């Protein structure tokens, strides 16, 4: 399976978030990549901050890769899990640009763990992962049917 892992371009203009505005490595996506590649999947990992790509450019790169599944983070890094940005505008913007060209979609991060239904509605993803995402993402990639994958939520 082809899987795209995306850390959107986080910006804080007009944001009510007062946390650290410096870019951080998306460790959870790196761990996902390692597990997915071990299982034989083809993985594209993109980080808007490190690669200086806006969300439209990220979406174009994902679409060119033509993945079967796209995973997007709802917080800039695990460092933000305890105090995540309250809004979902950044991942929502990326998904809007992706416009259905990324296969099935999954969101990982604190929002899906704390408020899965609103996260699903606001992002329009197929599934949110609740809790630690690495092994769950690997399991999603290995299954055709997602309804029985534990630690996920769907509408």
Language-model segments: residues:
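Glycine-rich beta-alpha loop elements in corrinoid/cobalamin-binding modules
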Residues: 28, 32-155
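Short low-complexity stretches enriched in small and charged residues
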Residues: 3, 23-31
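Short glycine-rich His-centered loop
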Residues: 3-21
């Amino acid at each position: 399976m082809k899987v795209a892992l995306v850390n959107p371009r986080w910006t804080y203009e007009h944001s009510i978030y007062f946390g650290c505005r410096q870019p951080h490595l998306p460790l959870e996506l790196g761990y996902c990549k390692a597990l997915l590649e071990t299982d034989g999947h083809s993985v594209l990992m993109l980080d808007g901050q490190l690669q200086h790509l806006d969300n439209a450019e990220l979406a174009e790169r994902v679409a060119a890769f033509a993945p079967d599944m796209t995973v997007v983070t709802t917080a800039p890094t695990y460092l933000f899990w305890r105090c995540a940005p309250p809004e979902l505008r950044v991942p929502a913007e990326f998904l809007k640009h992706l416009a259905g060209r990324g296969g099935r979609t999954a969101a990982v991060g604190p929002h899906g763990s704390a408020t899965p239904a609103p996260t699903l509605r606001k992002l329009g993803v197929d599934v949110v992962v609740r809790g630690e995402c690495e092994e769950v993402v690997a399991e999603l990639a290995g299954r055709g049917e997602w309804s029985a994958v534990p630690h996920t939520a769907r509408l």
